[in-house]
Amino acid sequence: MASKAHPVATTAAADWRDFLALTKPRVLTLVVFTGWCGLLAAPQSIHPVLGFTAVLCIALGAGAAGALNQWYEADLDAMMARTANRPLPAGRMDRQSALHFGVGLGIFSVLLMGLALNVLAAAILAVSILFYVVVYTIWLKRRTPQNIVIGGAAGAFPALIGWAAATGRVETLPVLLFALVFLWTPPHFWALALFINSDYARAGVPMLPAVAGQRATRIQIMLYTVPMVIAAVAPWAMGLTGAIYGIGASLLSALFLLLAAQVGFSREADPARMKAERRLFGFSILYLFLIFGLVVADKVLA
């Protein structure tokens, strides 16, 4: 059983950098990019000011979800080396401030999206925030090793939101992009979990390597990569994108599959020597940036 740990007492007033850290800026970058690509890939364009507003709302909504995640998980963050210096466990901010910030940011983002763009985009944004905070953070993360599988839906919403903001509809292409991110999430996070497993185990988070072991995790990474690759090339196969996307996505997905296979067949047990796992984790981030970039490039250049 994991030892108990609590955030240290707040010693100083939080500054703007602490509030920014609550939004998880690194995660925010990918979320905003996929939302922006969903907006640009839509068949009809919108005024640049409205487009900027839509992307801003996606960023604020994702930031709100990140803040509420850190509010709820302050005790876990205090036990994990990679999160111990976050504002709450480090004592630079009190939990009530984080809660108020997250709730306020979330409400503002949804209201602004609804008033400036349309109700559908605002509704999907609201669902994405609630899904990440309630379903993933509060309900799943501490209870099941499948937490990241189901919770992965939260990170898959931005492309849907961007498309809906531009069109007021949800159509096949953004749904396929949603499926792609949903299926990408387990290999991405399980690759990370393999080489920081001790952090999760110390905090008592039932990530797959800690519960089912390394071998089962490696197999699951390969099993999820196959349908992810199918989802990645499906837009081209269905005639929703052109050759620019299709060829690029096929090559990138083949490389992803190769890296996943290297992880799957690896017998390395020492986290410090897990090069294949680190390669897959690093490439998986680049992969998603490039895939979504290809969606936009295909529309602009075709």
UniProtKB/Swiss-Prot annotation:
Q: Name one GO molecular function term.
A: protoheme IX farnesyltransferase activity
Cystine bridges: none
What EC number(s) does this enzyme carry? 2.5.1.141
What pathway is this protein said to act in by its record?
Porphyrin-containing compound metabolism; heme O biosynthesis; heme O from protoheme: step 1/1
A Gene Ontology cellular component where this protein is annotated is:
plasma membrane
Biological process (GO) annotations held by this record are:
heme O biosynthetic process
Which family is this protein grouped under? Belongs to the UbiA prenyltransferase family. Protoheme IX farnesyltransferase subfamily.
Does the UniProt entry include the keyword S-adenosyl-L-methionine?
no
> Any extra detail in the entry?
Carbon 2 of the heme B porphyrin ring is defined according to the Fischer nomenclature.
Cited function: Converts heme B (protoheme IX) to heme O by substitution of the vinyl group on carbon 2 of heme B porphyrin ring with a hydroxyethyl farnesyl side group.
Identify this protein by name.
Protoheme IX farnesyltransferase
Against NCBIfam families, the record matches this protein to: cyoE_ctaB, PRK04375.1-2
Q: Which residues cross the membrane?
A: 27-47, 48-68, 97-117, 119-139, 148-168, 176-196, 219-239, 240-260, 280-300
Q: What's its catalytic activity?
A: heme b + (2E,6E)-farnesyl diphosphate + H2O = Fe(II)-heme o + diphosphate
Provide the protein's localization. Cell inner membrane
Which PROSITE patterns does the record match to this protein?
UBIA
User: HAMAP family under this entry?
Assistant: CyoE_CtaB
Where the protein is mainly located, per its record? membrane
